[in-house]
From Swiss-Prot:
Protein name in UniProt: PKHD-type hydroxylase Caul_0045
Class of enzymatic activity (EC top level): oxidoreductase
Xref: Pfam families: 2OG-FeII_Oxy_3, PKHD_C
Signal sequence extent: none
EC number(s) given by UniProt: 1.14.11.-
UniProt cross-references to NCBIfam families, sorted A to Z: PRK05467.1-2 (NF003973), PRK05467.1-3 (NF003974), PRK05467.1-4 (NF003975)
Organism of origin: Caulobacter sp. (strain K31)
Domain Fe2OG dioxygenase as annotated: residue spans: 78-178
Entry-linked PROSITE patterns: FE2OG_OXY
One example of a Gene Ontology biological process annotation: intracellular iron ion homeostasis
Transmembrane helix in keyword set: no
Length: 227
């Protein structure tokens, strides 16, 4: 399941985040790379334990936890502290698959990476290239979203970032361990949740059909969740 989540941050919030990040020190992006990724990676990254990363990371996590679409789609159990990368002219990131398990250097937690998320912080008109390209059974998907929007996709996906040819692309990226590890099951639960919300709007939250479907949703989640 691949899902665009618009307006995670407002335009003003995204601009504030960019301002803080632009003033922060950046290092070579291979600091956090696994072996495969290091062979393909050419970007800059913000130190994860720095003040800027902590401040902006907290803003992003708070915004995601308040976003109903993200919560419904990801069913987050643990969210890794956000990381930040920057691509200037000539920089890109070749094909790779993210590590299956990661340790959060900020919290010390170890998590299974079920989902990857990128929150775009640069306006798409401010740079050329820099598209996130995610591969799945249906082909290649090019993603370049408005500042403040996010893309959520399975961490098992082969993906890359195309070379930037003008401007600078700044984004936050990180991983989520879901309550439901199986992507297909998460997709079914999201479809059911969306359908329940639509039905509730049409017939009311106390309608017997809404109550029945809500019960079925929670019983499926109870069956599949790992806590």
């Amino acid at each position: 399941m691949m899902l665009q989540i618009p307006d995670v941050l407002t335009s003003d919030e995204a601009a504030y985040c960019r301002g803080v990040l632009d003033a922060a020190p950046w290092v070579d992006g291979n600091v956090t790379s696994g072996f495969q990724a290091a062979m393909a990676k050419n970007n800059q990254q913000l130190p994860q334990d720095g003040a800027a990363a902590r401040e902006i990371g907290a803003i992003i996590v708070q915004a995601l936890n308040a976003n109903p679409l993200f919560v419904s789609a990801a069913l987050p159990r643990t969210i890794l502290s956000p990381l930040f990368n920057r691509y200037g002219v000539g920089m890109g990131f070749g094909d790779h698959v993210d590590n299956s398990v990661r340790r959060d250097p900020v919290t010390g937690q170890t998590l299974r990476t079920d989902l990857s998320i990128t929150v775009f912080l640069s306006d798409p008109d401010d740079y050329d290239g820099g598209e996130l390209v995610v591969e799945d059974a249906y082909g290649s998907h090019l993603v370049k979203l408005a500042a403040g929007a996010a893309i959520l996709y399975p961490a098992s996906s082969l993906h890359h970032v195309t070379e930037v040819t003008r401007g600078v692309r700044t984004a936050s990226f990180f991983w989520i361990q879901s309550l439901v590890r199986d992507d297909a099951k998460r997709g079914l639960l999201l479809d059911m949740d969306v359908a329940i919300q639509r039905l509730s709007g049409a017939v009311g939250t106390t309608d017997p059909s809404v109550l029945s479907l809500t019960g079925t949703y929670h019983n499926l989640l109870r069956m599949w969740a790992e806590v």
